[in-house]
Amino acid sequence: MSKVILKIKRLPHAQDLPLPSYATPHSSGLDLRAAIEKPLKIKPFERVLIPTGLILEIPEGYEGQVRPRSGLAWKKGLTVLNAPGTIDADYRGEVKVILVNLGNEEVVIERGERIAQLVIAPVQRVEVVEVEEVSQTQRGEGGFGSTGTK
């Protein structure tokens, strides 16, 4: 397996923050940090856009997936609103994370706090072909819980 290189440009408001890193040897996601000037209060059911201070150069054929951190979701009720957020390989703007507080208490995010995970994943592009009919399956049109919960 060849090594995939992720090039990162750190913006001025993130110069003192660590670069994204894996927390353990087998972590799938790189931790993204809040590049905010001062603590940010997030009220219950409020959403905020948090800068990371990073611009990524994701290799062609890959995407960045911004995912919630399980600890923030469990302990504080915070999650990534559009999870997984997609960062396309040709995007060159600052990476920002949309967080929402689904809890009943106000949450404070501190500068440098780990707020999300970034997973770099391969992308498979497809050719779109319009047809008159699609093949039948045993499942058919069943969806939205049609297979039960047990």
UniProtKB/Swiss-Prot annotation:
Record: residues binding substrate: 69-71, 82, 86-88, 96
Single GO term (MF): magnesium ion binding
Cofactor: Mg(2+)
GO biological process terms held by the UniProt record: dUMP biosynthetic process; dUTP catabolic process
Catalytic reaction equation(s): dUTP + H2O = dUMP + diphosphate + H(+)
EC identifiers of the protein: 3.6.1.23
Pathway, per record: Pyrimidine metabolism; dUMP biosynthesis; dUMP from dCTP (dUTP route): step 2/2
Keywords from the named record: Hydrolase, Magnesium, Metal-binding, Nucleotide metabolism
Cystine bridges: none
Pfam families linked: dUTPase
NCBIfam families membership: dut, PRK00601.1
Function: This enzyme is involved in nucleotide metabolism: it produces dUMP, the immediate precursor of thymidine nucleotides and it decreases the intracellular concentration of dUTP so that uracil cannot be incorporated into DNA.
Family label: Belongs to the dUTPase family.
Name by which UniProt lists this protein: Deoxyuridine 5'-triphosphate nucleotidohydrolase
Organism (species): Aquifex aeolicus (strain VF5)
Lineage: Bacteria, Pseudomonadati, Aquificota, Aquificia, Aquificales
